[in-house]
Every structure is written in C-alpha cells, then in structure tokens.
Amino acid sequence: EMSPEEQDKLMAQLQVQRHVKGIDELGIPRFRITNGPVGVGMGDGHPSPPATALPMTIGLAAGFDPELAREYGDIIGSETATLGQHVLEGPGVCLHRTPIAGRNFEYFSEDPYLSGVMGVEVTKAIQAHDVIAMGKHYAVNDQEYERFRTSVELDEHVLRELYLLPFEMLVKDGDIAAMMSAYNRVRGVYATESRYLLNDILRDEWGFQGYVQSDFWSCRSAAASLNAGMDHEMPDAKWLNETNVKNALQDTSLEIQTVDRALVRRYTQMFRFN
C-alpha cells in the first residue's frame, strides 16, 4: 500500500525530464513520456537519441488515406518503443481555424470527421507497439494566441459537432489510452477543472477508460482538478504536490479515494501496455 508521500511522487513528472520516477520498494517502474504528433521528440536527455522527423500531419490528412495514416503511426509507435518510451503525446486532433495558428502543422484538418478518421488510425498503430497514445489538446484549444487565458464561448451543438467529434472518435473507435487536457477555458472553466469535459462527457458518456494528463503548466489547482477528473500534472508538481494535496485532504475539499482513482487510472494503462 502506498503512503500519501509515495502517492504524491507519482502524481506529477520529474522536473525537467518527461519521466515520472518509480518506487523501487513497491516494484513501480519509471514512467517515460515523449512528444509528439509528427515524430518522437524525446526531450528527456541531452543529447537525445535521434528519431524520424515525419512530414506535417496536415500533409498526411491532405491525402485522405487512412492506410497512410496507419503507416505514419506505425513509424511513431515503433520508434517510441525502440527508444524505451512508454507514452507518445499525440495525435493532436484540434481543428484548423486560422492559417497562422502555431500548431497547425501537428493537427490534421479543419474538418472534424477527417481529423477523427486520421487520428484513430494513427492511434491504433501507435498502441499496436504497446505504447500509450495521448490525444490532445482536449478541448477547443484551436489557437495558440492567449491560450492560457482565453475562454471559448460556444453552444452545445457547435461544441459537439465540430470540436469534440475527433476526440470522441479517438475514444470510441481508437480505444485511446490517454488524453491531454488543454490550457484554455471553455465557457469560463479551465479545461483541467471541467468536470463536464473530463468526467461527464469523456468518461460517463463516451466510456473513456484511460487517464488524463495536463498540458505543461495548464493545471491550476489540486482539489478542483482532481475532482474534475484530471489525473496527472505535467511537467512538475506545482499543484499536485504533497503540501497542496495534504491541505485539500485536511479541509475535505478532496477525498483520498479521488487520489487513489487518479493513480489507478494511469497504472491500469501502464499494465495494459506492459
């Protein structure tokens, strides 16, 4: 059984590197995470081993060829596994909404269905190599400008028909193992604290069985994030640290079962993918 201190060590990654330290005494291994949607970009050592720099996914989607997307994902999954990594932060299935958006190169299309089809094939191919694929950035993170402060205001029809559809396809058709929450707010609530997005829709409605990781420094709270369904903070324990979690447990804004649940979700996927 883990102590509260041991639980806290596993709630966030090791500073600087994309690794979550294991606990040898409990037989829990180090957990290695790498970026990204257009090829393995390890960023967890200097120098990092080389990997293939693949063409932009917008070019991949322009071929309208699911089989090509599967080959694309096969390269990423194979190299991720060969380099000893456990999680690949991708595919990205946000939509193109402006031609100068900073991450258009790693998203597929302005069309949600095409984005979903291509993302599903990439996901299946990555996970065929016993690598956890992580869909991002959930949700409505379709611009980089002011992404830390923007609140996206949209009605339910638009939210579901356009912005959530690719993520829904990743879950239902791709059986994706992890999801990355976004920086922005949706209807005034930060994505990392949105019970509606992370729990009501993602898990209760779509049946997602994996875990949710924050984007780098997108987490803004301990209790609110964990209660909403966010499971893992990146890249360090700014919020999910021993002090904050202990205080939240003491003031009853957080229950220990919620902490347990966050860890179980992640380690269930670790065991699933060996």
What positions do the PLM features span?
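Glycoside hydrolase catalytic-domain context in secreted enzymes
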Residues: 1-274
